[in-house]
Each structure stands twice: as C-alpha cells, then as structure tokens.
Amino acid sequence: ELADFIDKAMIATGPMYNSDLFSVINTTGGNTFNIPTVNDTTVAAEAHTEGGTVTDDAGKDVTFGQKSLGAFAFDTEWVRWSYELANDSIFNVESLLGELLGERLGRIANSKLTTGSGSSDVEGIVTNSGLGKTAAAVAAVTSDEILDLIHSVDPAYRNSPKTALMMNDSTLAAVRKLKDGNGNYLLSMGNFQAGVPNQILGYNIVVNQAMDSLATGKKVMLFGDMSKYYVRKAGGPSLFVARERFAPDYGILGYVRFDGTLANAAAVKHLITA
C-alpha cells in the first residue's frame, strides 16, 4: 500500500531572482537589451576667472557606455514517467514533477546569476564585483576585515536601501562567532518568522548557497548595493508535457531564458581569502 503523500527532500538555493533586492527586468522576447551607463564621478568643475576664456577642448566631455543583457537558455532535459504511475498514484505525478523541474530551473538560475563566467555565459554578480578586501587567512575572516569590506564601498552605494552583505551559510556560521573589541557579537540576530533578517552594522545579510565556502582564494562575501545587479528574464519559465512522444509513457521538460550583469563594479565588492 502506498501513502497518500510524498516526502520531498529540500535544499536552499539563493536569492538571485528576488526583485526586492535585485533589479529584475521582465521582457517578452530575448533580443539583446542594453542598459546605458555613465561614470562622471572623477570629474569636477573648475574655478572661473572674471573675463577669462572657458576651456573647450573636449577634455571634460561626458562618456557614455552600456551593459548588454542577452537571453541564455537552460533546460532540465526530458523527465519521463510511466502510464501506470500516472494512473495508479494517489498524488498528481505531473504536478509534482512540474514543481521539481521548476526548482531545478531555479537552482541553475541562482548559480549562474551568482558565479556565471560572463564569457558566452551569464555574468554572475560575484564574477564582476570589485575587490574590496583580501583576508589574511585562507579559511577565516575577521571582524576588522568585514569592516574594511564595508568601507571599501563608497557611501553613495552604502546608503542604498538595497545594500546588503551576501555569503553562503557556512561562511555565515563563521561570521556569527566573531566579536568586536568590546566582546559583543558582530552579528545582530534577526527573527525570520517576523521577517527580520540577520544584520551586521545595520546591513541585512543575504544567504546564497551558490557562493563559495571559506577556502584558498575564494570570493566568500559580497557587500554593496544589490540593486545595481540587473537580472533579465526573457519570458517566464516554461513546462512542456509530451503525451504522445513517449507513449504509452509521458514526458515533461522545463525551459528558461535569462541573463544578468552588474552595471558598476564599484557598487558591489567582494572579500577574497588569501
């Protein structure tokens, strides 16, 4: 006899599709989507002498750039199930498989949007982040190093409501043990049931399991304005069900298209281990 329920294994993935944190752009098609950029932060006005000639040598013209978002495609491969299972099961097999394939698509999206190479691939937020701090140790970070990471980002980005620290859970476990010079824990515990996240110095902590754990030469922590990372969704995730191709059995396939890019590496910086 078969139970009328199924126990499904679970694993946390990450936040990269979260529009409350990142800038998510939804488009119906997959044509290249360009984001204009400009960086005029190193240029200032000059003193003017009465009656003097104003310089006009194009030396301070504004230079514009752009970041491009494509639509990289990913699929789950066909997953098959038997006619007998479809008809004899108490639970809805097709619905369950659709849910599982949706989670598979979510895992690849989170992974690529985090650490994608950007070379004929999605550009992950970690990949294009700027260097904020290099830790002294191979498999540990200190409270001072986290402070240095935070202050490596300009206050213009630090003051954004979407500024946060991002790391995986094993790194967070190490960070939870850190104390300041007065013996107080650096991390302020939140209340997830009440929707209050953990914080460090008032900045929310975002757990992303696609980020590296503490080891040699790993970018284990990000800090900055997460809204400067743009996620492009080309249409929505799709599920295709084949009822005749595998007859008398059935098949189901998941498919999704997306891309991502960090508009300015100064907005989000990483802490890398030695």
Where are the regions that the model predicts?
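Flexible loop/turn segments at secondary-structure boundaries
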Residues: 42-45, 88, 171-175, 212-215, ...
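A short acidic (Asp/Glu
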Residues: 125, 175-179
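C-terminal amphipathic alpha-helical segment
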Residues: 160-173
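Sequence/fold signature of self-assembling virion shell proteins
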Residues: 63-67, 72, 95-102, 179-274
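Generic hydrophobic alpha-helical scaffold/packing signal
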Residues: 102, 147-150, 172, 176, ...
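Acidic/polar, low-complexity extended loops/arms that serve as protein-protein interfaces
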Residues: 1-161, 187, 192-198, 205-206
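Active-site-proximal beta-strand/loop segments in catalytic clefts of secreted hydrolases
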Residues: 38, 167-170, 255
